[in-house]
Design a protein with these regions (language model features):
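Beta-strand/loop-rich accessory regions of lumenal/periplasmic or secreted enzymes
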Residues: 14-332, 337, 376-380, 396-399, ...
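Carboxylate/His-rich catalytic cores and anion/metal-binding grooves
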Residues: 25-28, 63-69, 416-445
């Protein structure tokens, strides 16, 4: 069904080999087998065509310039509050079509009664080689014949860094006639809106740490901003960056219409750049000659940005406000007692809270290492593994060992503290993109999770003891993003394949955590899907643990060529996994096996 402007609903209608989406304040079409995200967009002030939107366009450092080919759109969500459509895409290298075809997925989400859309772009290295990205840029042009380049004009004025950490450095533009102005905070915006008249084209870029720093151009003067490692290392940011660091946007406004683009968590996912000029806006998800982005074969990365269409008379502080809210949206809250009554999680809800214990848990969660960068955000370097030399002298990435997102989900459920959900979301998104193999000629890798290694997956291996799903399922439950569910199922399928390999055929030849983690993964997937296929190997693992105990007396692990020892850590993982299986299928023989294993540990 169709909806009228501003009636507070959304609709999606199949039309002309694509879809027409009406959101009340916007309506737009997407077309199958096209080269532009939008076939047409109407904000009821101006109609934009496919020629107003270009990219994202990919270039690599081997000299390839790629053409974007969008496949068939499919409906992900059809209202009443949001409308989402998604399409698989190909980035095809000109002149090298057969050998270079880099896949991508684009999703467009509109909102009831809102004049903005969210764009997610997920690139996947579906080649056998490293993909060294030279640039990845999206353009919105004011007119069909406008030309915007990715070149950045050197500015004599910059926003600078908020090194005080207070956001209180004052600016004075009362005697500045332009053509470029820099101001921090909203105090001077009314004055600068008069100096930079939208009827002569006003250009803006903005970043924030505490107060937002605006660079404003009049008469269509180019303004731009770049975020790189040098920018970040000089800026004092004391926020919980998973929740909020600051914003990063570009705005173009003339006498007819205006649009701003905000890149989500740009600082955390550097390098990034934006520019606004007389012809429109360039959004540089990877700017040229800024940093190094090398995606290994099978690696993916999703990024997102919001396009906000607004009237020429909308105040800059309102545009900034919407941009900031996009960076830190409201999160739902459910009281811990509701989680406890629902029984949807293991019982981590004490009757009486101990302040010292709670402070300790929160400190551990808040004190986790944060590693910035487009391919690093959401993961952390394991200094212990690195010092041991496991990365051959290079940093070893933990790859979310041992299901850090699940721990965050439990912390959110038991406390209701918002930032733990944001920790979950950021780390799970990294996990789904970087730590999982999306392309390989080896079927034992597809869908599986890489063990901690240098370069996230470079020279990596896959074993059952380093594949987890509970945090991904938590992410799916909290966000509704089915990619969490699909990724968890893919990991489960990989575990089933690995369990058929020789490494796992003889009880006791691998340590207890190997099949222990496999059992925990498969049990969680059975609970989620109610599909009996996950139970076949569960029963096999339980039987192996019984044979293991009978053969060795306890769950001993191979150590040296002539030694088998008790490794408490490994055994405890196995116990926890068998316990989870027992809770679903209680049997006295399993209960007694658990008790004997724990007795052996404590003795």
């Amino acid at each position: 069904s169709e909806c009228a402007k501003q009636d507070g609903t959304v609709s999606i209608t199949p039309v002309n080999n694509g879809f027409l989406i009406k959101c009340g304040s916007l309506e737009y079409e997407v077309a199958n087998n096209s080269s532009s995200i939008f076939r047409q967009l109407n904000d009821y002030r101006k109609v934009y065509t496919d020629k107003n939107f270009e990219g994202p366009y990919l270039k690599d450092k081997d000299g390839n310039t790629y053409k974007l080919k969008i496949g068939e759109w499919k409906v992900i969500e059809a209202g009443p509050v949001t409308a989402s459509v998604e399409a698989e895409c190909s980035n095809i290298a000109a002149g090298n079509i057969e050998n270079k075809n880099i896949k991508a997925v684009i999703k467009v989400t509109g909102y009831a009664g809102k004049p903005w859309v969210n764009i997610t772009y997920r690139i996947i290295n579906t080649s056998d080689d490293e993909l060294k990205i030279k640039s990845l840029v999206f353009y919105i042009k004011k007119s069909e014949d406008s030309v915007i380049t990715e070149q950045l004009k050197p500015l004599k004025i910059t926003a600078g860094n908020d090194s005080t950490g207070c956001g209180d450095i004052r600016t004075d533009n009362s005697h500045n006639d332009g053509p470029v102005f820099m101001t921090r905070g909203t105090t001077e915006l009314d004055m600068l809106e008069k100096k930079a008249d939208v009827n002569n084209i006003r250009t803006v870029v903005a970043t924030s740490n505490y107060k937002t720093s605006f660079i404003i151009g009049k008469n269509g003067e180019e303004v731009n901003e770049v975020i790189d490692d040098k920018y970040l290392v000089k800026e004092a940011n004391e926020h919980f960056a998973e929740v909020f660091y600051g914003t990063f946007m570009a705005d173009y406004t003339d006498g007819e219409d205006g649009f701003s683009v905000t890149v989500h968590q740009a600082q955390q996912n550097y390098p990034k750049a934006v520019k606004s000029c007389r012809e429109g806006v360039a959004v540089m998800l990877v700017p040229e000659n800024v940093g190094e982005i090398t995606m290994q074969s099978g690696m993916a990365k999703e990024q997102q940005f919001m396009i906000h269409f607004h009237s020429p008379d909308m105040k800059l502080w309102e545009i900034d406000n919407r941009s900031l809210i996009y960076q830190m949206p409201d999160r739902p809250y459910i009281a811990p007692e509701v989680f406890k009554r629902a029984g949807v999680m293991i019982d981590v809800f004490p009757v009486k809270y101990n302040d010292d214990f709670e402070i300790s848990l929160m400190a551990k969660a808040d004190g986790h290492s944060r590693c910035y960068g487009m391919l690093n955000w959401g993961d952390t370097v394991d200094q212990g593994y690195t010092v041991q030399g496991r990365g051959g002298g290079k940093p070893v990435w933990s790859n979310n060992e041992y299901d850090y997102p699940h721990a965050c989900a439990l912390m959110y459920a038991r406390t209701g503290v918002r930032r733990f959900m944001d920790y979950l979301i950021v780390s799970a998104k990294h996990w789904m993109d970087i730590d999982v193999c999306h392309y390989s000629s080896n079927p034992l890798r597809i869908g599986g999770q890489w063990e901690h290694t240098a370069g996230h997956c470079k020279n990596g291996v896959m074993v059952c003891s380093h594949e987890w799903v509970e945090g991904l399922l938590d992410y799916y439950h909290f966000t509704g993003d089915k990619r969490g569910y699909d990724t968890a199922v893919g990991i489960g399928e990989n575990v089933l394949k690995l369990l058929e390999t020789p490494m796992y055929q003889v009880p006791g030849e691998a340590n207890a955590r190997e099949t222990g983690w496999a059992l925990r993964t498969l049990t969680a997937l059975y609970i989620e899907t109610n599909d009996n296929k996950w139970l076949v190997k569960c029963d096999w693992i339980i039987d192996n643990f019984k044979k293991w105990e009978e053969e060795y007396g306890d769950w001993l692990s191979p150590y040296t060529d002539n030694t088998a020892i008790r490794v408490g850590f490994m055994i405890s993982i196995a116990v926890g996994s068998v316990m989870r299986y027992y809770r679903i299928f209680p049997r006295e023989d399993i209960r007694q096996m658990i008790l004997r294993a724990v007795d052996d540990l404590t003795e």
